[in-house]
Amino acid sequence: MIHGLLGRKIGMMQYFTKEGRAIPVTVIAAGPCIVTQIRTPERDGYSAVQLGYEEVEARKLTKPQQGHLKASGGKMLRYLREFSADDPLAHKPGEVVTVELFKPGQKVDISGTSKGRGFAGVVKRHGFRGGPKTHGQSDRHRAPGSIGAGTTPGRVWKGQRMAGRMGGDRVTIQNLEVVEVLPEQNLLLVKGSVPGARNGLLQIRKAVKG
């Protein structure tokens, strides 16, 4: 069995359980994905299954990408990602992998690109408290304060939390519960929120710690 799938975030909604309890869920359009390559220890040094997702016109891909995909079934696919599998050699290029890979109640890890926030200060970016609001304070309400000592070390330490570009990073949220699987619509409902904006690409994997 392959341990993951590619999909797109559709949005969030309320889901009512059989007990009548409302829980927040994220709706994900997961798959179908196509197996495009099998990685083997003899040839590649590791085992994995490469999946392709989302058909696209050939002109939008480079010649090497087109050649790679023609050798594995001919469908032109926008995204290629690799996933581990119980037995990679049990799968063949061209095989279709659907959302039925997952079951309700299962735990999954979901990775995506977080929303970009642009240049942000330390209060928003790192949760700094800021300076005092009164007693003569005039313009340092959201300033970081001191960023280091004096002569020793005479520099700012690497990794010092400062203002800068926020968001747009790869983020993984672990152990999200699968609430419902809808194979006919290729939809996956998971409890809680997932990284990124609507329509963002997601990698859904079997939970490592679940």
Curated annotation (Swiss-Prot):
It comes from the Bacteria. The keyword Transmembrane helix does not apply. One of its GO terms (molecular function) is structural constituent of ribosome. Residues 125-154 are annotated as: Disordered. GO terms for biological process: translation. GO terms for cellular component: cytosolic large ribosomal subunit. InterPro entries: Ribosomal_uL3 (IPR000597), Ribosomal_uL3_bac/org-type (IPR019927), Ribosomal_uL3_CS (IPR019926), Transl_B-barrel_sf (IPR009000). Gene3D superfamilies: 3.30.160.810, Translation factors. Keywords: Ribonucleoprotein, Ribosomal protein, RNA-binding, rRNA-binding. One of the primary rRNA binding proteins, it binds directly near the 3'-end of the 23S rRNA, where it nucleates assembly of the 50S subunit. Part of the 50S ribosomal subunit. Forms a cluster with proteins L14 and L19. Belongs to the universal ribosomal protein uL3 family. This is Large ribosomal subunit protein uL3. It comes from Chloroflexus aggregans (strain MD-66 / DSM 9485).
